[in-house]
Design a protein with these regions (language model features):
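Signature of the first transmembrane helix
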Residues: 4-64, 161, 216-246, 256, ...
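Membrane-water interface segments that mark the loop-to-transmembrane alpha-helix transition
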Residues: 9-23, 48, 60-105, 118, ...
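Helix-loop junctions and terminal segments of transmembrane helices
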Residues: 59-76, 141-142, 254, 258-297, ...
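Hydrophobic alpha-helical transmembrane segments
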Residues: 117-124, 150-199, 217, 377, ...
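Membrane-interface junctions at transmembrane-helix termini in multi-pass inner-membrane proteins
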Residues: 70, 129-151, 343-371
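Interfacial segments at transmembrane-helix termini and the short loops linking adjacent helices
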Residues: 39, 106-123, 295-298, 316-346, ...
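Interhelical loop/hinge segments that connect adjacent transmembrane helices in multipass membrane
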Residues: 1-4, 8, 121, 147, ...
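Transmembrane helix-bundle signature of multi-pass secondary active exporters and lipid flippases
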Residues: 49-57, 228, 251-274, 308-311, ...
Length: 449
């Protein structure tokens, strides 16, 4: 028998705070860099941050998704998952950092604008501890320890702002980059403290082979994530090869601001994946009916649709108010670039929730298919539009790519769940009423309940 499930809204609400942490940290650091060393410095930081992020994603081999899937289905104990994932994180991370350094050396005189090698080393030093703390995240989410998950993510974000934001003044770009490994180390250390405590309350007995099962599952998600990086991050890399560092910096601000639209749907996505897996396992065990499982998934998707409205309002306000006030006149084009990105960003927010349900039902290979289908079109658009229109071409290509990914996610969601489009996409009055109930829940909230 599974443990009593926590209110999904409570997890999503905490996840909103968590998802906002890295974005706020990145935005604050971006503003500080822009004000101290200008658009070119902002562009260089964005490129190195992208390099470290892609290196970590490649090195992770999708184990994050596999850990969440296995632990949430009560097949892997916290203690064993903790030990195996931290060892894997540091080993895989070292390989990823070395691979990232090789890519930097290859593109140093083109994409990376002749940046010094020690700057890349600083950014890539964050990869091993970053993977360890991400794996800790996965275990805590699978156990529905939302407060621990929040503490872990926010400790990472706060360290990034404090260290990088302070050191950028005396040391410029180098100081900002120091924040990346510092934040990752703090995150990994916080994960150790939280998982040691969580392992003492875990009652799951291992049946053996959990790491291999997690790797098999994760590799399918990893393939999808690897291909999706073409949609999410290669625009910056390719733009860096054709445009100036200042153009990359201006475009990166538009990306940062519009990415805020993903905070709400990603919060829902984050808690839906382990919940969908847990519900599916319970349905197979006869603890609940298949219709109960479908109803919970459909409700979550409808909330994803509802959340696009406040997300759009927030982004428009950020573009029109925050950019002029925080970044200044040199970043005026970031406003218009943000509006080009906005339609695709909003649609992809819904697509992320759909993809989470697909993977939670045990079909991560379909998310791989989505990425494999959209990647060729995305690359074609990037190489067609970016050489001609620089950052404007990047924004248009990215927006179209995001929309295509959302459409494909909807197609495969229907194939996996058989849930009707109206049932999944048209919000009900009871869905709106849920937000009033969430406020009541917040007033009565106690950790772990």
């Amino acid at each position: 028998m599974s443990e009593p499930r926590r209110h999904l809204g409570a997890g999503a609400a905490l996840s909103v705070v968590v998802q906002g942490g890295p974005l706020i940290a990145g935005a604050v650091l971006s503003v500080v860099i822009a004000r101290t060393i200008g658009p070119a410095g902002n562009g260089d930081f964005a490129l190195l941050l992208t390099l470290a992020g892609i290196s970590a994603m490649v090195a992770s081999v999708g184990l994050t998704a596999g850990i969440t899937y296995e632990v949430s289905r009560r097949r892997w104990s916290v203690k064993q998952a903790f030990r195996a994932s931290y060892l894997a994180g540091f080993a895989f991370g070292l390989v990823g950092a070395l691979a990232g350094l090789a890519v930097f050396a290859l593109l140093q005189d083109s994409v990376f604008n002749h940046m010094r090698t020690e700057l890349a080393l600083l950014a890539l030093a964050s990869v091993p501890p970053l993977l360890a703390y991400q794996y800790a995240d996965a275990i805590l989410l699978a156990r529905e320890r939302y407060e621990g998950y929040a503490a872990l993510e926010l400790s990472h974000s706060a360290t990034l702002v404090l260290i990088g934001g302070i050191l950028v003044f005396p040391f410029g770009l180098t100081g900002a980059l120091v924040g990346l490994p510092a934040a990752a180390v703090v995150g990994a250390a916080t994960g150790v403290l939280l998982l040691v405590r969580e392992s003492r309350r875990d009652t799951v007995r291992d049946g053996g082979g959990s790491l291999l099962r997690a790797l098999r599952f994760g590799l399918q998600s990893w393939g999808a994530n690897l291909l999706q990086q073409v949609n999410y991050r290669f625009d910056l890399i390719i733009l860096g090869g054709f445009a100036s560092a200042a153009a990359v910096g201006v475009y990166s601000v538009a990306l940062t601001m519009t990415a805020v639209a993903w905070v709400l749907p990603q919060a829902l996505q984050t808690v839906l994946f382990p919940r969908a897996a847990s519900l599916d396992e319970s349905a197979l065990a006869g603890e609940i009916t298949s219709d109960d499982s479908d109803a919970a998934v459909a409700k979550a998707v409808r909330h994803g649709v509802l959340l696009t409205l406040p997300a759009a309002v927030i982004i428009i306000a950020l573009l029109l108010v925050a950019i002029p006030v925080l970044y200044g006149s040199k970043f005026h084009d970031s406003i218009l670039l943000g509006f080009v990105l906005l339609p695709g960003v909003l649609l992809l927010g819904i697509g992320k929730v759909l993809s989470s349900a697909i993977a939670g039902r045990g079909y991560p290979r379909f998310t791989l298919y989505i990425a494999a289908i959209s990647m060729p079109l995305t690359l074609g658009l990037y190489f067609l539009l970016i050489p001609l229109y620089d950052e404007w071409g990047a924004a248009a290509a990215s927006s179209v790519s995001y929309a295509l990914s959302a459409l494909l996610a909807l197609v495969f969601f229907r194939r996996v769940t058989k849930i009707g489009l109206r049932r999944a996409l048209v919000p009900l009055s009871e869905d709106v009423a849920d937000y009033g109930g969430l406020l009541h829940l917040a007033r009565a909230w106690r950790p772990g309940r």
